[in-house]
Amino acid sequence: MPRSLSLSALRHLSAAIALVLAAALAAPGAARATFSIVAYDSLTQEVGVAVQSKYFSVGYAVPWALAGAGAVATQANVNVSLGPRAIALLKSGMPAAEVMRALAAIDSSFAGRQIGIVDARGGSATYTGPRAMDWAGGETGPGYACQGNILAGPAVVADMAKAFRETKGELAERMIAALEAAQKAGGDKRGQQSAAILIARPSRTNPEYNERYVELHVEDHKTPIKELRRVWEIFQGFHLAGAHLNYAAAFEAEGRKDLADAERQRVGETLQRALARGEKDPSVLNGLAWACASNDIFLPQAVQAAQRAVDADPRNVDILDTLAEAHFRSGNAVKAIEVESRAVTIDGGKSQYLKDQLTRFRGGK
């Protein structure tokens, strides 16, 4: 056997590989029977995709989003390359409907695709190829496109769109509500397995949000939408509260106080919802309580959440510090000193931060 290939053989091998890759791109991909929504928020300029399927790791291939450009869902007999191609066209300023026509022109197997697109101005388009498996179809409206294939029936898409229109709150909240409504209407008639949500939001100070403001995946689960809801609620306390405060600071620096206040308000509303649903995760409660207390908003709720977190994890000095801060900001220095003293004792006096906090509370500053 030769130890190496000749130059001529390498050229033939390279040509063969190129032909195989070209054929793979042109051919229908693995079927992704699924339902999805692509959507736009005119207030925050967020764009995103939420999706569920009886397919492992649907979030790997279906959702694409870029702030200032738009969002795309690629499904059915999926050609994954159409996702980034569509984003590039949207980024150039091409409206959603024109992007769809452009994709059809470059894909010889477009009849097997299902695609939803929303652009950064709220324009939307959906396409279901004649080779998509029944029931398959879509619906568009201002700022959204819903679509699905191998569904229980047309009510899946109709109810998904209706829930999105009627649900209030953040874009992610509205999109997850849309998935829940679609599943309630019958969903993917083969069942459930994975779900995902991807949202991008413009930011100059935090450029990472331009591609990933919210990104959550449930790869393999008996009830993936229910699990997506659960991890979304955790995500709000761990990450989203901080993101809202980042936007608030950026808007404040630009002199846009109304927008800064709106970002802080969203943190408070998230905390209120966590309390209302009986959230038990001490980390979630602590994150939201600290975000509110440190910004002097929703202070009674911050005290309540922090106390609930302490009850669940009574020797966690970080959580005790949050409770003390919330009491202090609420005007109860005596209680703040009592709680912070407990934190210092548990810590054994090692943390200078905790000791400084105690000094601050005693000084009334």
Please report, for each region that a protein language model flagged, where it lies by residue.
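Alpha/propeptide regions of enzymes that mature by internal proteolysis
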Residues: R32-R190, I197, E219-F251
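Start-of-helix register in tetratricopeptide repeats
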Residues: G242, S283, D318, Q352-Y353
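"A position-specific structural signal for the A-helix of alpha-solenoid helical repeats
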Residues: N246, G287, T322, R329, ...
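Structural motif corresponding to the intra-repeat A-B loop/turn of tetratricopeptide repeats
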Residues: E254, N295-D296, S330, K365
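Alpha-helical adaptor scaffolds
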Residues: L259, A276-E325
